[in-house]
């Protein structure tokens, strides 16, 4: 499936204020805002030893939701615009069949056959399976996710999913850092113009949020690098609760942009 989404960093811990802003935004476009619960998510990302997935803009993830459901996910960047990104996504509950599908897709993307006889490594523990296949863990994080759906009045289906993520990136030596993010995901493909409009309104009218066109995997890797270079300073770039400040976000974005310029 094609995942179309955008993201903003939230500058406030006043959730009532943020929820009210999003409620009004949803209503202004003719949708019904409906809260859809809270999830606790644990994500673990993997790559090969030589990081071949990263080099090909592919992400491999194991996601545990509320300690009840475990999903395996593969994403590959397809396209980016000024307001959103498009990724090809394969995601489902972790099973032998899903593992097979994802490994075959990785081989297809890379035009390689580097994982032969992969099913013989299958284990009910997905992380152990991927390690046995030669993958390494490159990032772990925990997210508290609050979900608000934008419901279409005409068909009563979810047109957009708004999620408020409080995400803590876990690094060695207890160097954990948190950011608060709003993601908007398109659920009905004929509403792309409305997604653009949501983004435009938030960019222009909302000082509480900062447009953030960088995925969590990249954001976390840059945070990790800056922490170990001692370039993110406590009480300046992150507060006493380890939540990133605007100063910290600007350092992260500057680093990403500088690397992008060099690459181009």
Task: Describe these PLM feature segments.
Residues 1-264:
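Phosphate-end processing signature that detects enzymes handling 5′-triphosphorylated RNA
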């Amino acid at each position: 499936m094609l995942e179309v989404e955008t993201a903003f960093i939230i500058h406030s811990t006043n959730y009532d204020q943020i929820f009210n802003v999003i409620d009004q935004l949803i209503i202004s476009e003719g949708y019904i805002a409906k809260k859809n619960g809270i999830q606790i998510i644990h994500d673990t990302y993997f790559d090969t030893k030589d990081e071949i997935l990263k080099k090909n803009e592919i992400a491999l993830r194991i996601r545990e939701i509320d300690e009840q459901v475990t999903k395996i996910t593969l994403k590959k960047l397809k396209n980016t615009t000024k307001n959103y990104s498009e990724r090809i996504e394969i995601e489902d509950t972790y099973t032998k069949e899903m593992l097979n599908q994802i490994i075959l897709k990785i081989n297809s993307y890379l035009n390689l056959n580097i994982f032969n006889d992969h099913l013989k490594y299958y284990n009910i523990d997905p992380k152990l399976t991927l390690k046995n296949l030669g993958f390494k863990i490159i990032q772990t994080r925990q997210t508290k996710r609050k979900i608000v759906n934008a419901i279409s009045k005409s068909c009563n289906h979810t047109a957009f999913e708004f999620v408020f993520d409080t995400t803590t990136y876990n690094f060695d030596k207890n160097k954990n850092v948190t950011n608060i993010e709003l993601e908007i995901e398109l659920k009905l493909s004929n509403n792309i113009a409305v997604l653009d409009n949501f983004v435009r309104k938030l960019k222009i009218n909302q000082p509480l949020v900062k447009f953030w066109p960088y995925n969590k995997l990249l954001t976390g890797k840059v945070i990790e690098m800056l922490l170990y270079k001692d370039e993110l300073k406590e009480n300046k770039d992150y507060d006493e609760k380890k939540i990133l400040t605007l100063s910290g976000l600007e350092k992260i974005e500057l680093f990403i942009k500088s690397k992008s310029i060099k690459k181009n």
